[in-house]
Every structure is written in structure tokens, then in C-alpha cells.
Amino acid sequence: MSIINKAAAIGGGVIGAGWVARLLLNGIDVSIFDPDPEASRKVSEVMKGARRAYKQMVPGGLPKEGKLTFAKTIAEAVADADFIQESVPERLDLKHRVLAEIDAHAPANAIVGSSTSGIKPTDMQVAMKKHPERLVVGHPFNPVYLLPLVEIVGGDQTFPEAIEVAKEIYASIGMKPVVIRKEIEAFVGDRLLEAAWREALWLIKDGICTVEELDDIMRYGFGLRWAQMGMFQVYRVAGGEAGMRHFMAQFGPCLKWPWTKLMDVPEFNDELVDLIATQSDDQAHGLSIRELEKIRDDNLVAIMDALSKQNKGKGWGAGALHKDYTKQLAKLAAKKPAASTAAEKAKASKPVKKAEKPKKKKKG
């Protein structure tokens, strides 16, 4: 059950709309601000896909949706919000302007999460003159309404209490919060993806394989292993009865071989862009983006549902969380009164802690 009653979403693109969908489908009221005149239509399209996926997850009926309001200003959107998620484009100057306005108008005890995929929170906090201590990075993965991972990163001015409250908030809407121990650009997930992306660009550019062949190598091979065990546990099993030490002794030396070009970046010229875009068009076989999104969502639900039945019915990995989340949604759907009142009761029992500025040390 969520510990927030009203949320605000600043930015309604793919990620922002995904946050809106997850929050609304958990019965939480959301006020959104996005200057794009097409924002309402785009959010509506994402909501259609999210509702469809959630109906598969909870066939017995979904909770009463939260109310969605389109605000005319950031100030209007964040008024009375317990939780604010910023999802504007990845430009530091824009982040500064938006966060400064959020900070000026949001309640002092509201947690502010940023969806940035690479900017350090310390670099964003400088724009927040009132309460920089309540800003955390809350980096999700697309589609936000289905993929549970959220990377939480604190900056130099972030209070530890803010990180703890952020963890509770994200967990309450069915997510898997992972706190990154040290502040670093691009955090963890995107750093791994960038390394694979760079090497993939070289493989396509050099004609080693096509984009479809590369994707097949991932989805028919190690991608299936990663989805349920990650990287290190897969390698532990690959080491046999001797485990990880044997694996590292056997395969560690190959890291010295010059197999990859991970530190080099191919020139992103028109020729490479055209090559990849053309092959990607061929790979789609005429399917639209919306059709591909539907296939993606159906597959994700099926994978998580399958994993939820493993480990003697307790669920495994993302499946264990999926099992608990679908139970939570079903329980919320069966509850009376409506979800917003239930969230208010939860908030009253465990309020979001109000941030306090550290006391200045006395001179002398």
C-alpha cells in the first residue's frame, strides 16, 4: 500500500508517462505538468498500454485509478504533493530551472525524485536553494509501469532520511529500489548498457552481424540467463561445483585478450545511422511502435508471471516481487473505501519525515 496520497509528475514523455501510469494504477492521484501540447494524447496512449498489461496481471479487477490532473504550471502541479518525480530531458540547465521551481513551490516534506539516467544528484542540487536535502535520483527503466527496478542515488546534500523515505515510496508502488552506494555518472544499469551498446555499434559497423542477428544472439542466449540470474550468479553456476573462484581462474585471463573495442566509439555519422536504421526497419517486419510495445509488455508480464511460480511457489528474482505486487493490487482493488482514502490512512500511520537542515557549527 502506498504511503503517498498525491503525487506530481513533471514531464510527460515516455518515462514521465510511465511513472504516471504506475502511480495512477496504484490508486494515487497525480498532477502532471508538461508544456508539450501533445502531452495529454501521449500520456493517454501510455495509459492504454499500461491498463492492458495490468489487466493481465490482475485478472480479478484493478484498484480504483487515481485521478489525473493536467496542471498549467509546475507550481500548480506540486502544490500539496507528497512525492514529486521529475522526468524532463537530459539537459542540466533545464533540470536546474525545473528543480528550482519545484523546490520553491513544493511542500517542505515532499520527496523529489529525478528520473535522470546519468546526471549526478549533487550537480542538480545546486539549483535548489530551500531544500536540496530531499532530492534523490530515482532512475527507472522503460516501461516504468512494468519494470520494477529503480536506482536510488543521493547527492552531497541528500539526507539519509530522504533516501529511506524514497525507498519506502518506490517499494509501496511495487518497485525494487536499489541504493547505489557511491555517486557516479550514469549509475550502474546504464553504464552496463552503454558498454554493450558501444560494442554492438562496432559489430554492426564492421559488418560482423546485422541488428537482428545481434538481438537474436542476446534473446536466444545469455539474455534468458540474465533475466533470472543476472551476471555474477550465472557465472557462479558456470564455474561448476568449485563456483566463482574456479570460473574466475578459468576465464579471468581472457580479459587480457583484445576482443572488444569498449573504450573506442565509432563515428556516429550518417552512414552508420542509415545502416542501423534501415536494418532496424527490416527487423520490425512492418510492425508499428505501438504494436511492438504491446508485444514487449505481453512478454514482460509472461516472463515475470513464469518466474513468480518458481522456487517452490515463492517466486524467483523479479517474479517474487511480481507475485507480491499483483497480490497487493488485488487486495487494494477489493478494499473499500477508495484507494485514495486508504493511502491517506497509511500516510497518517507512517508520515513522510520532514527534512531538517543541519545546524550550523558555532565559530570558535
From Swiss-Prot:
GO terms for biological process: carnitine metabolic process; catabolic process; fatty acid metabolic process. Residues 336-364 are annotated as: Disordered. GO terms for cellular component: cytoplasm. InterPro entries: 3-OHacyl-CoA_DH_NAD-bd, 3HC_DH_C, 6-PGluconate_DH-like_C_sf, 6PGD_dom2, L-carnitine_dehydrogenase, NAD(P)-bd_dom_sf. Its main location: cytoplasm. It is an enzyme of class 1 (oxidoreductase). It comes from the Bacteria. NAD(+) binds at G11, G12, G13, V14, I15, G16. It is found in: Cytoplasm. Pathway: Amine and polyamine metabolism; carnitine metabolism. One of its GO terms (molecular function) is NAD+ binding. Residues 348-364 have a biased composition (Basic residues). The keyword NAD applies. Its EC number is 1.1.1.108. Keywords: Cytoplasm, NAD, Oxidoreductase. It catalyses: carnitine + NAD(+) = 3-dehydrocarnitine + NADH + H(+). Belongs to the 3-hydroxyacyl-CoA dehydrogenase family. L-carnitine dehydrogenase subfamily. Catalyzes the NAD(+)-dependent oxidation of L-carnitine to 3-dehydrocarnitine. Homodimer. This is L-carnitine dehydrogenase. It comes from Mesorhizobium japonicum (strain LMG 29417 / CECT 9101 / MAFF 303099).
